[in-house]
Amino acid sequence: MRNKLLFLLCAFLACFGSAKADIWINSVYFPDSGFRTWVQKHFDKPNGTKLTDEELASVKEIISWKENFSNVENLVGIQYFTELETLRLYNNRYAFQSLVMYLDLSKNKKLKKFTFTANDYFNPYSSASHGNQASRISVSAPDYPYLRSVNLKDLPNLETVVIDEHILSELDLRGCPNLKTVEVTNGHNSISTIKFDKCLHLETLNLNNCFDYNYNYMDWSLMPNLKHLNVDDNHFESLDFSSLQNLESLSCHFNHITSLNISNCRKLKSLICSGTDIKTLDCSMNDSLISVDFSECKKLEEFPKLPKGIKSITCQYVPLLATADLSLYPNLTELNAAYCDLKTFDASKCRNLVALNLNYNFISALDLSCLKQLNIKKTFISQKLNLGATRIPNQIGLWRLELPEIVDLDKIFSYDYISDLKRFNYTLYAEYYTDDNGTRHPSFVTNFLYSGSNSTNIIFSYSYQTNLFYEKDGKQTELLMDAWVAAKQVPSGVEDLAAEKTVKGVVYYDLQGHESAVPFSGFNIEVTQFTDGTSQSKKIIK
C-alpha cells in the first residue's frame, strides 16, 4: 500500500512538473505594448486573458509586414511560441512601425528560418512606393533600425539565417547543425567574431560587408559541402579555399588579398575577385570554371591563366588584356573589357562572342565582321582618343591630328564637333597627308584646339563603320563605333605667324544658337577667336 501511494505521488509530481506555465496577455509576459497588441489581434483576445497551450502551439510563422506590426520594439514573449518555425522581420520605423534591435530566439527550438532586414529610409509620400527616389529621406544615425544583437545558438532545426543591415558585433551559430543558408550582409564591417560548429549541410554563405578590420580568418573546413560563397567588401588579406572542394561560385571582391588559392575547387563555375591586390591568378586547374571577373586587379603581373572552357571574362581596368591570346578560349561568348587601354582589338580571335563591352578604350578603328552571333543589345564600343595636334606649315591657325595607321578614312561614316558653337564657327575635315618620307597617314584637320588645362576636353567625335550588320526596322543596318576625340598640342618645330597669338575676331551667340557680330539683348556667349586657332568664351549679359 505504501509503495502504491509513493508511485501515485511521483506520478502526480511528474505531471505537475511537465505542465506548462500559464501564459497571459499582459505586460509581464509580453512587456512591449506593440507586440502585446499584435498578440491580442492575432488571437482575438483582450488584454489580461490567458493563452491556451493549443493557441501558443498554433503560431508557426510570424512575418512582420504581413502581420501589421505597429510600434514593436522588442519580441520578449516570443519564446512562448514553442512551435514557431519561421520568423521574418522588416525594421522600418516609418513604413511598418517596427524597430526590433535586440532578439533572443534560443528558446524557439523548432525555428527553421530567421530573416531580418532593415531600411534606413522612410517614405513620406505615396509616390515613394513606386520607386520615386526623391521621396526617400534618410533617417539620422541614432534612428538606424539595424539589428544589434541576436541569440541563435543551439537551434537544432535552424536551416536559414538571413540578416541584412545590421551592426552586430558577434554572431554565434554553434549548435545549429542543420544550417543550409547563412547570409549576414551589409554589417558596416561591425562583426569581430562569428562562430560555427561543423555544418555539413551548409551550401550558401554570404558575408558581404560584414567583418571589422581585425577579422582576417575563417575556418572554411567547418563547411566542407559549401557551394556558394560571398565574402565581398571585407578585410581579408589571404584566402585559402583548398578545403572547399564542392564550391561552385565564389565572390571575394574588394578585399586586401594578395593571393588566392582555389586549386582544389575543381567544381568552381563562377569566380569574382575584382578590386583585390592579387599579383597572379591561376585558374588553369579549374576545368569547370565558365565565368571569371578580375576587374580592377591593378597589381596583376600577368594575364590570369584560365581554362580552355571559359565562357565569360570580365576584366575592366586591366591593361594586361592586350597581352592575352583570346584564341585560347574557343568557347568565349562574353567579354567585358571596358577601360583596358586597348588600342586595337582582333575580333577574329573570339568569333563566338555574343556580348562585348569595349567602352572607353583607345581603339580608333574596329572590324567586327567575323562576330556573326553578336547581340547588338549587348554590345558597347564607344571609345575615347587622345591625339597629338601639330601646326600645319604655312596654314595659319590649322592643326593636324594624326590618326593611327589602322584607320581607313573611307570607313568614317560621319564626324562633327560636339558643340553647336564650334560647329557654326570652326573647320573640321579628314584627309590623308604625305610625310617627308612619302608615307600616307590618316588625319583630321581643325582650326580649334583647347589650350592649357582644357587640353583633354573632347573636341569632336566620329562614327566608324565596323563591317557588322544587323536588322533594324526590317533593314540591314551597320553597327557604328563612336570615338570621342580630345587633342593636345605637341612640339612640331613649325614656327609660323600663329606663334604670336593675336585676336582674329569676336562673335556672339544667343540661347538659340544665333550668331551675331554684336551682342544680343540679354544673355550672350562671347567667343574670342585667336590667330593660333584657339578660342576663349565667356558669358555676358547686355
Give residue spans per PLM region.
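N-terminal capping/linker segments that flank leucine-rich repeat
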Residues: R2, F12, F16-R93, D104-K113, ...
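C-terminal tail/sorting-segment detector
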Residues: R2-N3, I525-K542
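Concave beta-strand-loop units of leucine-rich repeat
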Residues: E61-E73, R88-M101, T115-R148, D154-N157, ...
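C-terminal per-repeat helix/turn "cap" of leucine-rich repeat
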Residues: N74-Y80, D104-K107, N151-D154, D172-G175, ...
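Hydrophobic alpha-helical segments, especially N-terminal targeting/anchoring helices
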Residues: I78, C210, E296-C297, T434, ...
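Residue-level detector of functionally pivotal "anchor" positions at catalytic/ligand-binding pockets or at interdomain
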Residues: K488-E515
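Short, surface-exposed loop/turn motifs with a glycine/proline- and acidic-biased composition
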Residues: D510-D532
